[in-house]
From Swiss-Prot:
It holds the Pfam family THF_DHG_CYH_C. PANTHER family: C-1-TETRAHYDROFOLATE SYNTHASE, CYTOPLASMIC (PTHR48099:SF5), C-1-TETRAHYDROFOLATE SYNTHASE, CYTOPLASMIC-RELATED (PTHR48099). It comes from Helicobacter pylori (strain HPAG1). Catalyzes the oxidation of 5,10-methylenetetrahydrofolate to 5,10-methenyltetrahydrofolate and then the hydrolysis of 5,10-methenyltetrahydrofolate to 10-formyltetrahydrofolate. This is Bifunctional protein FolD. One of its GO terms (cellular component) is cytosol.
Amino acid sequence: MPNRGVVLLDGQALAYDIEKDLKNKIQTITAQTHKRPKLAVILVGKDPASITYVNMKIKACQRVGMDFDLKTLQEDITEAKLLSLIKDYNTDQNISGVLVQLPLPRHIDSKMVLEAIDPSKDVDGFHPLNIGKLCTQKESFLPATPMGVMRLLKHYHIEIKGKDVAIIGASNIIGKPLSMLMLNAGASVSVCHILTKDISFYTQNADIVCVGVGKPDLIKASMLKKGAVVVDIGINHLNDGRIVGDVDFNNAQKVAGFITPVPKGVGPMTIVSLLENTLIAFEKQQRKGF
């Protein structure tokens, strides 16, 4: 149970409301155009976590009435064949967005694969062109998890402008794009990573702490400022079957002013942000007569 003084940032509830809005929009579009958005999902191999995440995305598509095309490929598929499939999706007028589930097998160059996706269908927001637009504050597809985090903070009227933000994790998927979004919103941002000597130096002085590195209980209550906003992006599957984040939730929530639970925090916002990007891609393609 959460501490009485802390506010839980309920991503599941917000995502549910956004899904209802998306469903209504798609129904209206379908009635008017006899077309609907379609997300292509590529899964390579049989990684259990990847299969789980893909299934969650497919179920979300079904809930809002969005079509999908799932391609499950053998782990030993050649890079050339994967790139050829992406090229086919790029030119397929029935496909609104293309998503390649990460991570990919070691013999495949992930950067090359992500760069092969048409930027106008890059609903994961990982293409260098879209990342570049993010950095220069031009309209682009935002990576789903950072997009979901910002949407969640906005929903709870959490001020970012002028605040000190500590981001733990510098990945291309979460940490780097989230730092740019925070910077664009007027925050002073510190990004910590594996070579950071003393993470607590940054977290103890931060108004907002965001962490997503995949290490249970990395962030302790003693590392937080009283009343801090704590965004836990980590997802860790423990041997006892529990799913936890990167924050010691039970103790951290006694110090924090706002905190995301795991699960039901950032995860649902990531998926619904992907759906939003796919709808945006569809609408842009329709305006261009694609």
